[in-house]
Amino acid sequence: MSLNVSRLLLPSRVRHSYTGKMGAVFIFVGALTVLFGAIAYGEVTAAAATGDAAAVQEAAVSAILGLIILLGINLGLVAATLGGDTAASLSTLAAKASRMGDGDLDVELETRREDEIGDLYAAFDEMRQSVRTSLEDAKNAREDAEQAQKRAEEINTELQAEAERFGEVMDRCADGDFTQRLDAETDNEAMQSIEGSFNEMMDGIEALVGRIERFADAVSEDAEAVRANAESVMEASEDVNRAVQNISDAAGDQTETVQQIALEMDDVSATTEEVAASADDIAKTARQAAETGEAGRETAETAITEMNEVESRTEQAVASMEELNEDVREIGEVSEMIADIAEQTNILALNASIEAARADGNSEGFAVVADEVKALAEETKAATEEIDDLIGTVQDRTQTTVDDIRETSDQVSEGVETVEDTVDALERIVDSVERTNDGIQEINQSTDAQADAAQKATTMVEDMAATSEQTASDAETAAETTETQAESVKEVFDLIDGLSEQADSLSETLSRTDTEEASAADLDDQPTLAAGDD
């Protein structure tokens, strides 16, 4: 009712302001009171002008009654305008606000008031709509969080299982089975990156280990070939030694014979037949010495050829071991790459720990994954250190083998020089024996004219004695040279034995690893290719 009155009495602009409405009502009441007072005053004045006291009294009473009635009307207007349903509206709004505080957001907040009370209703309605929207957003966010938590738990479980699989494969690789490969069963980019890097690394290690095995086999085969050639050289040296000994013995016999001839040359005339016979014996001995010297020279030349072959084989072995050393260095680089992967895995574990800390109460899965990845990194680092130790051992053995082979090459070169010296000595011996043989032949031919050429024969015998002494000295020198050569060959044998032992040790070290090539070789029963076939 009051709203209808105010709508009728007040303009729209005033109705929208509670303060304006109050001012308008007070102005209207004041104006109405002044108007009624003026009317009452006019009636009282008119009655007084007539001089009728009763009329004045009646006019005064009427004015007072009118004022009382006007006061009631004014109070009613003020109550209807200012009070109206304000208290009821505020009480209703308070009740509805209390229901909203209890969680009832379906409360109707509608009013026909157009003043501040109506604005207050509208503000509460907007607040209710905002709270309802916020609650819906919070509900959706909670559902999204629950789904994200569920997905995170699934990812944690998947990563944990994947990490366990990776750990098993890496353990088998660390035990020497280089045929194992990672096969990621997850879409996680970090795990796929680890899979690709690890598989690429294992391919490189497997190829290098295969090459090292082939090189070790080639070194072992070359060592056997060198040993066989060295045995041939040893046998040839023994033949040369025997030949030189025979030459030395023959030269000694020849020297004694020549000295005996020199002592008996004073009685040349009486002993012409004896000289002829002795000359025949000396000629025979000289021919034998010449033949023996020629055979020794041929044997020495054969020894030189075989020593040159030994030297060539040794140089090939040195080249093979240097290539082996280069391959071992490449394994060292792969080992450094493993260490980098281990470092990256540690970083992944740190990231997982950080994500676990961010996830608050839901961090158990992340923590487990972080621990698993960290353990995986530590195992990878341990495998890397073991591979580094193996590489260091192989490098030390390879360097020792290269040094031994080079020393063997030096010994072989010295042996070749020794044999060449022996050949030169034998050639001098042969020349001396040939000259001795020529002299003896001349003595034999001049036996009929011995009396006339006694002095000449004496001179020739003296020359022959000097030549025989030189021959004996050369033969002794050749014998010493041959003994030195034999010692050099024995040293070569010792070096070859050391090389064979080191090659066997390297093969035994590599046999602890499994590769695809080794598995194929076991299945097909095919021989291992030598390093030169690569």
Curated annotation (Swiss-Prot):
Lineage: superkingdom: Archaea
Span of domain Methyl-accepting transducer: 229-465
InterPro entries, A to Z: Chemotax_Me-accpt_rcpt, HAMP_dom, Htr2, MCPsignal_dom
The residues on the Cytoplasmic side of the membrane are: 1-22, 82-534
The UniProt keyword set, sorted, is: Cell membrane, Chemotaxis, Chromophore, Membrane, Methylation, Photoreceptor protein, Receptor, Repeat, Sensory transduction, Transducer, Transmembrane, Transmembrane helix
* This protein's GO CC annotations: plasma membrane
A Pfam match is HAMP
Membrane-spanning segments:
23-43, 60-81
Topology, Extracellular side:
44-59
Disordered: annotated segments? 463-534
Segments forming domain HAMP: 84-136, 157-210
This chain belongs to which protein, by name?
A: Sensory rhodopsin II transducer
Identify the species of origin. Answer: Natronomonas pharaonis (Natronobacterium pharaonis)
